[in-house]
A protein has these predicted regions:
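Cell-envelope and extracellular/periplasmic
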Residues: 1-370
Length: 370
């Protein structure tokens, strides 16, 4: 006989995959508790749907799986204040922003797992010698291969940094070359899996944290932009200014300035959304990058560095310095935060000296007294 099935409450929209570790996983009610209470009215939005895997299958799998880990309740749950409690804060703010600006239904699959290294997020041996018996690619990414994703948001790298804050020794963490190679391969891997060589892939650069040495991972995240096979629609969101009391976040105690989980997830999500609006939805007035180094020329005894930027360059506000060492230098008047710090120049002998740096428009002019 004939069988009739009826499906209701179905919407068609754009689907995003959220992957990485705890800064992507971080729940709205945990990372942004003061703002969460004020989201009660806006959170009720049936045009935003989520699959929140949470801890289900968080140990990964040694073999590719055809199905996602089984979850309780509605697989594509409409956004409610209750659901917002345990969803990714970045995913929540990102979806709300896109839905408001474009009017399109937005769905996202929240697959991130805290404390995970990059080797768990790509296909085993996609990069020779890089594999994990606890692969999250196998049970959280591979099962989605038939989805037509609009894009991927990725925030990861803390667990691949050196354990010794004063070491760049790759035995204590990944070298910049290692991580950038694997990061670029991960992007290629996902684009192959989803059969879309131009799949938008946006990832977050690590924020500064305490005195932890993440310079190698942050450098690697920049280098990956040049190593990926096809750079189209591969973009990095910089979070160097992201600390606990950013923008609309209500934390003003200062403690979050030294938290490995920056509280301003609404701002990170806004930056991700700017990229999506530009690349996917055709918003030509959206910014797509912070300042990016473009070229260098000499002018007598000076070096002139030119950057690509939407506006003129500026010095980071002193309240955005987020590591203990820098705070101590500021408090003891050993660091002048009204001038541009951090540039060094080397001569033919290869010895680097601190450089004087002056901002002029989109350029930085360097000189050295040595």
């Amino acid at each position: 006989g004939e069988e009739t099935r009826r499906y209701t409450n179905i919407i068609f929209g754009d689907v995003y995959l959220l992957a990485g570790q705890s800064n992507m996983e971080a729940w709205l009610s945990w990372i942004d508790s003061q703002n969460y209470a004020g989201e009660k009215e806006r959170a009720e939005n049936s045009n935003i749907r989520t699959i929140d895997l949470l801890s289900k299958g968080g140990n990964g799998s040694s073999n590719p799986s055809d199905n996602l880990p089984e979850i309780e309740g509605n697989a594509w749950a409409p956004m409610t204040f209750s659901n917002a409690n345990t969803t990714s804060a970045i995913g929540y703010y990102f979806a709300q922003e896109l839905n408001k600006e474009t009017g399109r239904p937005i769905g996202y699959i929240h697959a991130a797992v805290g404390g995970t290294r990059i080797d768990r997020w790509l296909e085993n041996d996609y990069v020779e010698g890089i594999s994990s018996p606890w692969s999250l690619y196998n049970n959280r990414v591979y099962p989605l291969r038939k989805f037509k994703l609009s894009g991927v948001l990725y925030y990861q790298g803390e667990s691949d940094g050196p354990e010794d804050a004063d070491s760049l020794d790759s035995s204590k963490g990944m070298s910049a070359d290692q991580y950038s190679t694997i990061m670029a391969a991960l992007i290629d891997n996902y684009r192959e899996l989803f059969n879309n060589e131009n799949l938008p892939f946006y990832y977050a650069q690590l924020a500064r944290y305490s005195n932890q040495n993440f310079e190698n991972i942050r450098a690697a995240q920049v280098w990956a932009l040049d190593k990926v096979t096809n750079p189209n629609y591969v973009r990095m969101v910089s979070n160097l200014d992201e600390v606990g009391n950013f923008g609309s976040v209500g934390n003003t105690s200062g403690n979050a300035r030294h938290d490995i989980h920056p509280y301003g997830k609404d701002e990170v999500a806004r930056r991700f959304a700017l990229l999506a609006k530009h690349d996917i939805y055709g918003y030509t007035d959206s910014s797509v990058t912070g300042p990016q180094y473009k070229s260098m020329e000499t002018d007598g005894d000076k070096l002139i560095l030119t950057f690509e930027a939407d506006g003129d360059l500026d010095i980071l506000d002193k309240d955005c310095y987020a590591d203990y060492k820098t705070d101590e230098l500021i408090e003891s008047d050993k660091l002048d935060v009204t001038v541009l710090n951090g540039f060094e120049i080397a001569g033919e002998d290869g010895i680097y000296y601190s450089a004087n740096a002056e901002i002029k428009g989109k350029t930085v002019i360097l000189s050295c007294d040595e």
